[in-house]
């Protein structure tokens, strides 16, 4: 029973770190990256639709993103949605494709992005710690029910703590790499 709790906690911590990595992908660094548009929703025939489902997005150059809509009539809506998303990007529409040139980040904007990265990192750490707390609570319930001994409880609790430390270190490492990427000129 204790092994199941440990395995479940490990899987949940892994998912929390994976979610954090996906979240960081939407934070814009100095170069073009299609994932910055992941959260952009376009009002397409009255339904909010992710831009990635409406267009082919390519990165032909380091600082250029090209969006080629499958339906040419939606090009204006896609452009409006990108502007409305307030990503600090200025799309230019030539009637068939939308080009987004990524300007070089200012020092101030870089510092703001680092703050965002740190905020996301803290949220990910809280998620990992919540998984630890839930796992420890489950173990205590098992011990109260007599399914595991007090020594087993202590051992499993230590194992969960080791996993927690491992995943928090992973979050810190990912954050450090992203900060380095952002501060790179």
Curated annotation (Swiss-Prot):
For this protein, the record's InterPro entries field holds: Ribosome_recyc_fac, Ribosome_recyc_fac_dom, RRF_sf
Q: Which Pfam families is this protein grouped with?
A: RRF
> Which domain of life does the UniProt lineage start with?
Bacteria
Q: Which residues cross the membrane?
A: none
Q: Which UniProt keywords apply?
A: Cytoplasm, Protein biosynthesis
Q: Name one GO molecular function term.
A: ribosomal large subunit binding
Transmembrane as UniProt keyword: no
- What GO CC annotations are associated with the protein? cytoplasm
Q: Where in the cell is it found?
A: Cytoplasm
Q: Name one GO biological process term.
A: translational termination
The UniProt entry's sequence similarity note says: Belongs to the RRF family.
**In UniProt terms, what function does this protein have?**
Responsible for the release of ribosomes from messenger RNA at the termination of protein biosynthesis. May increase the efficiency of translation by recycling ribosomes from one round of translation to another.
* HAMAP family for this protein: RRF
Name recorded for this polypeptide: Ribosome-recycling factor
Q: Which gene encodes it?
A: frr
């Amino acid at each position: 029973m204790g092994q199941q709790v440990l395995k479940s906690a490990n899987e949940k911590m892994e998912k929390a770190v994976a979610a954090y990595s996906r979240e960081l992908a939407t934070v814009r660094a100095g170069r073009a990256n299609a994932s910055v548009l992941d959260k952009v929703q376009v009002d397409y025939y009255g339904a909010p639709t992710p831009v990635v489902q409406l267009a082919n997005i390519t990165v032909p150059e380091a600082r250029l993103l090209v969006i080629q809509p499958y339906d040419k009539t939606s090009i204006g809506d896609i452009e409006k949605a990108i502007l409305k998303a307030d990503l600090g990007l200025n799309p230019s529409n030539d009637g068939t494709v939308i080009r987004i040139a990524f300007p070089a980040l200012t020092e101030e904007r870089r510092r703001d992005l680092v703050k965002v990265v740190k905020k996301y990192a803290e949220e990910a750490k809280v998620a990992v710690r919540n998984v630890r707390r839930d796992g420890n609570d489950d173990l205590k319930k098992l011990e109260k029910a007599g399914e595991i001994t007090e020594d087993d409880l202590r051992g499993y609790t230590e194992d969960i703590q080791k996993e927690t430390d491992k995943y928090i270190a992973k979050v810190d490492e990912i954050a450090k790499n992203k900060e380095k990427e952002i501060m790179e000129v």
